[in-house]
Every structure is written in structure tokens, then in C-alpha cells.
Amino acid sequence: MKSSLQTFDQKIAAIAEHNQVPALSCAVQHKGEIIYSKAFGKYGGFNSNPVEPETSLFRIASIAKSITGLALGRMIDKKMLSLDESIFEYLPQYPKNNFDISIKHLATHTSGIRSYKGKELFSNKSYGIEEGLALFKNDSLLFVPGADYYYSSYNYVLLSAVMQIAAKESFGSFVQREVLDALKMSQTFEEAAKTSLSKEMKKRTVKMYSKTKNGFKRASRVNNGYKIAAGGYLSTATDIIKLGQAALDQSILESSTWDEVLTQQFVMAKPTYYGLGWQCNQELDDMGYIGHIGQGVGAYTNLFVYPDAELVVALLINASVPNLQTALDSAYEVLRKEIPQ
């Protein structure tokens, strides 16, 4: 194990130290114990302190969908809603587009709702969840719900609107109690609530960057408040490990609900590699992984869980650098194949 960790560290360090990222934080857990925890780079701006895996807060992007998936699972277990229910049971005023849309369609990205267009991804307007629906609710669907798969964060904006009506409380407060507190994820916070955090917490939030042909520049300010369920959280690498470990332990949800969350959907006999808020690749050298890749303004993130090896990897970068995924996969491969199962 020692040699594989050294090789893994060398690969991650090469990515971080060759000016390919402004800052990077990574943690690895094996059989319930942290075996690697390291960060590279500095906070940025006027803060020249080095980042740390236990305390530095990064934007987690779409890993937030995995948190939402567990919150949805909690609601299923509490019989607050069911996957096959129509969203119009909760949002009768939402435009019908001549088609019914189920809660499951939203959670599995099979609703036909479009993705971002124009500068929507970079919007810094302060929307609430229901206000955010106005961005896309009157647009035509790309296909009949259930007929195809199309990944869109707007599915999770609409899903969160339904969930908070079913819960009779705000989406954020339900998630905080039922998921974050339950998993002891004490270092995970709503990004939109950052203004209410202490000065110390703000200091622990890394600056976000965008990559240009001349290097990195500070990313545009964006407001992710309305898409909290899709990509609106800040967290640390070690806290995200707890999210992955929950999938291994099958904690906080009933077994049958975990099966729903972690089972990929099929559309027209084709795999989508997506469950309920969790990406599921079950065709990787007989050693499937579950988790999520996240990409957003000032963020690129990985949560990879390898159940057969009882291995969880969390990696957070403060810039959108999807071109590095192949190099990251190469590093994970070292652990995946060499750590004893």
C-alpha cells in the first residue's frame, strides 16, 4: 500500500505543481480510515496561506447532486413523496408542455429539460429556487419525458422546488438536518449563505479561477443560490469523503432506497450511468465506481467510490479544468488496482 500511495502522491503533485491548477485538495479513505490527505497551492487573492484538506473550503459543483440524492432518499424513506409522482402534484402552476414529468425524471436527468444557454451559467443575480425556475420553465422540452437522457442542472433546480414543498421547509434546512448533520459533514455549507458565515469561515474559502490561454485569472462572480441542489455547496476534501463513505456503509437510507439511488437507469435499452444524483459506472474492469464529477465556474471536482475495494477518493480544484480528468483517472487507477481488497 505504501508504494501505491507514493505513486499516487507523485501523480497528484505533478498535476498541482506544474501550474496546471491554482489549488488542489485531495483525501483518500480505505476501509473507513483516511490514508491520504494533502493539499497544494494557496488560497489566492490577498491570502497567501497554503490550502489544507481538512479546513479549506472549495466549491464542490455537481457533487451537490449526490447530496441532493441522499436528501431525496430520506424523503422517500419518510414517505414524504414517491419517485413516480407527478411534479404537478406539488407545482400545479408549472407549465405542463403537454407532458407529465415525474420526480424520477428530474432526479435521473430524463425529463427533457434543457441545460444552460447564453450566459446563464455565469449569472450573478440573486435568485431563490422558485425564481430560478423562470429561466427555463417556459421552454420546450428536448424530448418526451422518459424517452432519453440529457444531463442538466436545471433538473435539480426543479427537483429542489418540489422537495421543499413536500418537506414543508426550505430545501437547505432539510438537507442540513437530514444529510449533512446525519453524516457529521460539519464543513459543508450553502454557498449562498456565505455572507452569514464568520470572518474565519470566509478566510477558509479559496478564491475561484478560470483558465485562459495565458494562465489563470479570477473567475467571474456567480450566485449559485437558486441551484443549491445542483451545485451550490462549499466543502472540504475530508468532508466529501464522508459523503462517499455513506454509500459504502449504506447509512442514513433504507437498503431498498440505496438500491434506487445507486442503480443506473436504462433508456431505450441504453445505460445512462446515472442513478439518483449519483453517477454509476458498473463496467470498469469488473470494479465499478459510483460518485460524481463536478464542473462549474471556478471549480472542478471528483468524488469516486470503489465499493469492491472499500475505497473513497475526494478531490477538489478551484478552477474548471476538465482536461485534467485523464491524468486524475491515471492516479486513481494506481490505488484502485494496488490497494488490497
Regions found by a protein language model. Give the residues of each.
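Short clusters of small/polar residues that mark proteolytic maturation junctions
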Residues: A39-G41, K203, T301, I317
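Short, well-ordered beta-strand elements
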Residues: T301-A319
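Short, surface-exposed loop or secondary-structure junction motifs
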Residues: G44, N98-Q295
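Active-site SXXK
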Residues: I12, C26, G32, S56-D84, ...
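Short, glycine/proline-biased beta-turn/loop segments that scaffold the active-site neighborhood
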Residues: S82-N97, A182-L183
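A short acidic/small-residue loop/turn micro-motif
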Residues: G41-G45, N224, S320-P322
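Short, conserved catalytic-motif segment at the N-terminal edge
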Residues: K2-F58, M80-S82
